[in-house]
UniProtKB/Swiss-Prot annotation:
Residues 92-103 have a biased composition (Basic and acidic residues). It comes from Halorubrum lacusprofundi (strain ATCC 49239 / DSM 5036 / JCM 8891 / ACAM 34). Residues 177-189 have a biased composition (Basic residues). This is Large ribosomal subunit protein uL4. The keyword Transmembrane does not apply. One of its GO terms (biological process) is translation.
């Protein structure tokens, strides 16, 4: 199985033989577990203060007043979960273990399966990516792409090969996030677009484009290839990255 190699102008620069990893069976179940584990393992511990709701001089009036024996301060109930203004019954605990484990062989198979999904045009289209209908996947460009330093140069290559529509889709899809997250450093929600995989170091030229992520063939993971556990990300590979990913 071969893939067309494009030059920086979008022309045909030959072909490259795809390694066997691109023939891996499609396993969305394992990909989902790998992404879920990656997200869980980077969660920050979160919990309520151990003494939250207890720092009050509230006392129980005891018997004889026709009132519940709830500790009160100025006639306001405290400490009791089912009372107004009472403490939380079962608040989140900071010591809770939120990590998830995954067998090494399962994780490796998930990555290989996600890599193979980048070569399936139907899977990539179902994920919502926009690209020219006549574009052959996987999208491979010559190693000259790794020498680019300017964002406009990288965008020009994407336009030449027919993948620039996905950058526009991601840029137009950027919106203010709903909920409290926008006050916690996550103001905008940004759709994912092209993943750029190189051989030596992540591409500096492409990393500032809307929705674009960059990675090396050795370090690309399941979450890069399947954000949100949805496999089939539109991926641009350099020729050397294709050869290097064979060892994954």
């Amino acid at each position: 199985m071969n893939a067309t190699v494009h030059d920086l102008d979008g022309g045909d620069a030959g072909s490259v033989e795809l390694p066997a990893i691109f023939e891996t069976a499609f396993r969305p179940d394992l990909i989902g577990r790998a992404v879920s584990a990656a997200q869980a393992n980077r969660k920050q511990a979160y919990g309520a203060d151990e003494f939250a709701g207890l720092r009050t001089p509230a006392e129980s009036f005891g018997s004889g007043r026709g009132l519940a024996h709830i500790p009160r301060s100025e006639n306001v109930a405290r400490r009791v979960p089912n009372a107004v203004s009472g403490r939380a019954a079962h608040p989140p605990k900071a010591e809770k273990d939120q990590t998830k484990s995954l067998n090494d062989k399962e994780r490796q198979l998930a990555i290989r399966s996600a890599i193979a999904a980048t070569a399936d045009a139907e899977t990539v289209a179902e994920r919502g990516h926009a690209f020219d209908e006549d574009l052959d996947l996987p999208l491979v460009v010559s190693d000259e792409f790794e020498d680019l330093n300017k964002t406009q140069e990288a965008l020009g290559v994407l336009e030449a090969v027919g993948a620039d529509a996905d950058i526009e889709r991601a840029e137009e899809g950027r919106s203010v996030r709903a909920g409290r997250g926008k006050t916690r450093g996550r103001k905008y929600s940004q759709p994912k677009s092209v993943l750029v995989v190189t051989s030596e170091e992540p591409s500096r030229a492409a990393r500032n484009l809307s929705g674009v992520d960059v990675a090396t063939a050795r370090e690309v993971n399941a979450e890069d290839l399947a954000p949100g556990a949805h496999p089939g990300r539109l991926t641009l590979w350099t020729e050397s990255a294709i050869e290097e990913v064979a060892d994954r």
